[in-house]
Amino acid sequence: MRDLFIVGAGGFGREAIWTVERSNALSQQPQWNIIGYADDDPKWKKGDNFEGFPILGTLEEASRDYPGASVFIAVGKNSKRADIAKRLCGHDFPAIIDPKAQISPTTDFLEGAFIAAGAVVQVGAELGRFVIVGANAVVCHDAHLGDFVNMGPGTVVASGVKVEDNVSFFANSSTMPWITIGTGSVINCGKGVKESIPANTEV
């Protein structure tokens, strides 16, 4: 098994560990040995315990002490996730995929992705670096998600949609097919996007 530490001792971090543990349990050859959390929040001290796993210290401390470990960044805010990825660029960032996600074998996805339980990623879809696809979200066929995109639970990105980098979809939002969502845009809970929108648009 390969050592893995989680950045972010919080709800998303707990979900990541739960997903890894379930994946390990279902595998004949478990892949990951979870060694703990790294977190810069000063409320955490090195050696603390968070729900059964040790705090390894700050990001820099964990990176120094475990230089060969893989890292999963369990941070929902896109800009913060991007910053952490730069800071820890010497590590590898595996994708974590829930056993109950449905992913087409023709799907391309890159490092650091998280695909939650019940998510569906259809044929021909492309997922960029450090993408989050939340529980029961759907990426329809031939859609493209850029880097550091976060799809909240129940979100639907329709067929052929191009989602540029750093876009946030909150729960149960959706798009029409074959449109473009500009870089840095925010789609709020339950909102639908009917036509292409430019960068940094809030819907």
Each model region followed by its residue ranges:
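Glycine-rich adenosine-cofactor-binding loop
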Residues: R2-E21
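Alpha-helical elements of the RecA-like P-loop NTPase motor core of helicases
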Residues: R14, W18, A82, E195
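Short, solvent-exposed amphipathic alpha-helical segments in soluble enzyme
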Residues: V20-N24, L88-G90
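NAD(P)-binding Rossmann-fold cofactor-contacting core
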Residues: A25-K46
